[in-house]
Amino acid sequence: AGARQTSFYQRDPWKRLIRTLSLQNSVTFGTIKEADESANRINKLHEVIKGEDEVTGKIYDALDHDQLLWVHACLQVSSIFFFEKTVRKLSENEKDMYHKENMLSAKLVLIDENKMPQTHKELENWVIDLTRRKQFLLITDVANDVKSIIQTGPVPRHIKPIWPFISFMAFHTLPEEFRNLYGVNQKKWHKKVVNINLSILRITRPFLPPFFRLIPPARWAKQRIKNRPDLQFKQKSKI
């Protein structure tokens, strides 16, 4: 409903994605000042996103705590899932360490740490329980729009050749509940292709140079920690 209200994702989905990633990366990899500024900007944007959902008739509010926590939790669970599929398995202690560190960014976007699950496993179970709740997940016009955008790929020309593969992997790494919702019929050969490609990433990654192993904001943050303490995210980012 919030996406329908802004509708920016329809006018320029790629620009919307880049802007969202830029703000998120600034919170994660920027200086303390930059993280605070980006979080404040996110919070300001969220202040005006509220109303009545046309599909369910329920009230939505981008500053509602449960809705904020849902987005945060899905991002965290997805991040750890992808890391374990393409890098290595994490111990429960490592996952909890990430969870505790991630709570800092959650607080910046107005999520109450005292109302959050206190371990990664608890957070993951919270997400799973909600997805299995009847009528919690619905396919709406907005969800179908996003599905179409991912399938057709209105992306820069240099990315277009690999976009069908990215789209395929995006849909076929979704949890079963989400695949069913989007009508993604995963056959055995689909699963094989996914597993083979994830295995290739996991095997080859250690041998790749940092340019390919790390996203740019992570490399810039590493530079700042090692020898450039004054380096700011906005100085390097062209987003």
Whereabouts are the PLM-identified features?
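Mature, function-bearing regions of proteins
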Residues: 1-239
